[in-house]
């Protein structure tokens, strides 16, 4: 990948990430509180809906930028084989690699954010300090495995579906999709991926919010899912599915649309620059 492409992916990914995380933060808070062990009301209900937003604001740009740099680089690296039937597989591999890298940044931000969302009266920096004091760096990476196990299946569904919908729309209208059309494809892809991966999101939330030293905090996703199934059934496994779908559908519209638009503009500026 050349330097203009690298810079375009870096900036476009970061801009898209910040836009989505800040605009849709209230929906994310509602989803987290619905999935929390203490239940929606005890976790804060609709009070302090922006609790934890500083953590999201700090982490969103580098997280999204890291994802898209990796995603675009792996797509470029695999481009040597132009077989069209392998294209979805390339997108899956690129998205999976992007998630593994991005989660190194996302998880600490997410841990602090989610604990703030269910403890609205506690300041974000205090939560960050408490985690470091009580659990060390390991505490900030609580749920890394469960986050990766959530994000990779999500990306395996979302990104190939997004790319396929764009390709189909481009073929139908005989020219490359516009930014708004890319955003619509992103909304459909994101909403569908969000729905089918909600149980993994529930497990990840429970692990992140668990008390240090508890069995849930160990991070065994299957064990957590089994526990939720036994205590709450299917409703527990899909807790927060509608706000999650709404947030990620809107997020897909904004995120992927903003990414495509910003990426195209930056590449165009790069071509015009001497």
Swiss-Prot record:
Solcar repeat copies, ranges: 4-77, 86-168, 177-265
SUPFAM superfamilies: Mitochondrial carrier
Catalytic function, reaction form: S-adenosyl-L-homocysteine(out) + S-adenosyl-L-methionine(in) = S-adenosyl-L-homocysteine(in) + S-adenosyl-L-methionine(out)
Cited Gene3D superfamilies: Mitochondrial carrier domain
Pfam family, one: Mito_carr
A Gene Ontology molecular function term of the record: S-adenosyl-L-methionine transmembrane transporter activity
Chain segments annotated as coiled-coil in the UniProt record: none
Gene Ontology biological process terms from the UniProt entry: macromolecule methylation; mitochondrial S-adenosyl-L-methionine transmembrane transport; monoatomic ion transport; S-adenosyl-L-methionine transport
GO CC terms of this entry: mitochondrial inner membrane; mitochondrion
Effect recorded for residue 148 to G: In COXPD28; decreased S-adenosyl-L-methionine/S-adenosyl-L-homocysteine antiporter activity
Classification via InterPro entries: Mitochondrial_sb/sol_carrier, Mt_carrier_dom_sf
Consequence recorded when altering residue 135 to G: In COXPD28; uncertain significance; decreased S-adenosyl-L-methionine/S-adenosyl-L-homocysteine antiporter activity
Activity modulation: Strongly inhibited by tannic acid and Bromocresol Purple.
Tissue distribution of the protein: Widely expressed. Highly expressed in testis, with moderate expression in brain, heart, kidney, lung, skeletal muscle, pancreas, small intestine and liver, and low expression in spleen.
Keywords on record: Antiport, Disease variant, Membrane, Mitochondrion, Mitochondrion inner membrane, Primary mitochondrial disease, Repeat, S-adenosyl-L-methionine, Transmembrane, Transmembrane helix, Transport
Membrane topology, from the record: Multi-pass membrane protein
TM ranges: 5-25, 49-69, 85-105, 142-162, 182-202, 238-258
Disulfide bonds, paired cysteine numbers: none
Subcellular location: Mitochondrion inner membrane
Family to which this protein belongs: Belongs to the mitochondrial carrier (TC 2.A.29) family.
Role, per record: Mitochondrial S-adenosyl-L-methionine/S-adenosyl-L-homocysteine antiporter. Mediates the exchange of cytosolic S-adenosyl-L-methionine, the predominant methyl-group donor for macromolecule methylation processes, for mitochondrial S-adenosylhomocysteine(SAH), a by-product of methylation reactions.
Disease tied to this protein: Combined oxidative phosphorylation deficiency 28: An autosomal recessive mitochondrial disorder characterized by decreased activities of respiratory chain enzymes, and variable clinical manifestations. Clinical features include episodic metabolic decompensation beginning in infancy, mild muscle weakness, cardiorespiratory insufficiency, developmental delay, or even death.
Protein name (record): Mitochondrial S-adenosylmethionine carrier protein
Protein species of origin: Homo sapiens
């Amino acid at each position: 990948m050349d330097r203009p492409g690298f810079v375009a992916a870096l900036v476009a990914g970061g801009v898209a990430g910040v836009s989505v995380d800040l605009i849709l933060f209230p929906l994310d808070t509602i989803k987290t509180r619905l999935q929390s062990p203490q239940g929606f009301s005890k976790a804060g209900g609709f009070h302090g809906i922006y609790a934890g937003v500083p953590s999201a604001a700090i982490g969103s740009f580098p997280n999204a930028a890291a994802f898209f740099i990796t995603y675009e680089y792996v797509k470029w690296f695999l481009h040597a084989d132009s077989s069209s039937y392998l294209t979805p597989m390339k997108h899956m591999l690129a998205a999976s690699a992007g998630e593994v890298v991005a989660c190194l940044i996302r998880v600490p931000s997410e841990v602090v954010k989610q604990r703030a969302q269910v403890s609205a009266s506690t300041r974000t920096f205090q939560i960050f300090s408490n985690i470091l004091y009580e659990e060390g760096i390991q505490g900030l990476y609580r749920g890394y495995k469960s986050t990766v196990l959530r994000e990779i299946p999500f990306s395996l569904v979302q990104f190939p579906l997004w790319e396929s919908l764009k390709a189909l729309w481009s073929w139908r209208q005989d020219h490359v999709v516009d930014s708004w059309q890319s955003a619509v494809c992103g909304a459909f892809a994101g909403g569908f991926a969000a729905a089918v991966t909600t149980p993994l999101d529930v497990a990840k939330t429970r692990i992140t919010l668990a008390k240090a030293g508890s069995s849930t905090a160990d991070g065994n996703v299957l064990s957590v899912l089994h526990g939720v199934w036994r205590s709450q059934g299917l409703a527990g496994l899909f807790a927060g599915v509608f706000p999650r779908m709404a947030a990620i559908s809107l997020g897909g519209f904004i995120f992927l649309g903003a990414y495509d638009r910003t990426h195209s503009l930056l590449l165009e500026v790069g071509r015009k620059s001497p």
